[in-house]
Swiss-Prot record:
The keyword Lipoprotein does not apply. This is Coenzyme PQQ synthesis protein A. HAMAP family: PQQ_syn_PqqA (MF_00656). InterPro entries: PQQ_synth_PqqA. It comes from Pseudomonas aeruginosa (strain ATCC 15692 / DSM 22644 / CIP 104116 / JCM 14847 / LMG 12228 / 1C / PRS 101 / PAO1). Keywords: PQQ biosynthesis. GO terms for biological process: pyrroloquinoline quinone biosynthetic process. Pathway: Cofactor biosynthesis; pyrroloquinoline quinone biosynthesis. There is a cross-link at residues 15-19 (Pyrroloquinoline quinone (Glu-Tyr)). The lineage of its organism: Bacteria, Pseudomonadati, Pseudomonadota, Gammaproteobacteria, Pseudomonadales. Belongs to the PqqA family. It comes from the Bacteria. Required for coenzyme pyrroloquinoline quinone (PQQ) biosynthesis. PQQ is probably formed by cross-linking a specific glutamate to a specific tyrosine residue and excising these residues from the peptide.
């Protein structure tokens, strides 16, 4: 489990992008 804020932010951003792309 990574405790880096940058990694979490990047992952969240990627998920959001996929969500928007799926719309």
């Amino acid at each position: 489990m990574w405790t880096k804020p940058s990694f979490t932010d990047l992952r969240l951003g990627f998920e959001v992008t996929l969500y928007f792309a799926n719309r």
